[in-house]
């Protein structure tokens, strides 16, 4: 079996890592050993934050809906309870957008919710 020198393969793999580390500060951008650790850590952050993004957006939508509902005299939990009782199937993302961009429509939804809660 012939001897295999790793020159081409090693250069390719190092180049791939160093290209991924472009824009990093200090030795992280041009020293392979340090750059490799930085790129691996960046991958861990990406993986974690893709999941956290979903939680953070849901929390943002809830905060917006809560603020809008309180302007109409309801808390978030009471408002969401009324939504389910009124069988209004609108998710939090859409409700948040309605609360920001179409205040009249949100007011109508709140009126329906209040009517259902009073009944």
From Swiss-Prot:
GO terms for cellular component: ribonucleoprotein complex; ribosome. GO terms for molecular function: rRNA binding; structural constituent of ribosome. The keyword Ribonucleoprotein applies. The gene is rplT. Keywords: Ribonucleoprotein, Ribosomal protein, RNA-binding, rRNA-binding. GO terms for biological process: ribosomal large subunit assembly; translation. This is Large ribosomal subunit protein bL20. It comes from Thiobacillus denitrificans (strain ATCC 25259 / T1). InterPro entries: Ribosomal_bL20, RIBOSOMAL_L20_CS, Ribosomal_protein_bL20_C. Binds directly to 23S ribosomal RNA and is necessary for the in vitro assembly process of the 50S ribosomal subunit. It is not involved in the protein synthesizing functions of that subunit. PANTHER family: 39S RIBOSOMAL PROTEIN L20. The keyword S-adenosyl-L-methionine does not apply.
């Amino acid at each position: 079996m012939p001897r295999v020198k790793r020159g081409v393969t090693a250069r390719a793999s190092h180049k791939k890592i160093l290209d991924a580390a472009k824009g990093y500060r200090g030795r992280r951008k041009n020293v392979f050993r340090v750059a490799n650790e930085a790129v691996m850590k960046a991958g861990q952050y990406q993986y974690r934050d893709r999941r956290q993004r979903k939680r953070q957006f849901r929390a943002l939508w809830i905060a917006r809906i809560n603020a809008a509902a309180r302007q109409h005299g309801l808390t978030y939990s009471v408002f969401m309870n009324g939504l389910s009782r009124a069988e209004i199937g609108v998710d939090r993302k859409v409700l948040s957008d309605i609360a920001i961009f179409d205040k009249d429509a949100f007011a109508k939804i709140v009126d329906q919710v209040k009517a259902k809660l009073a009944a």
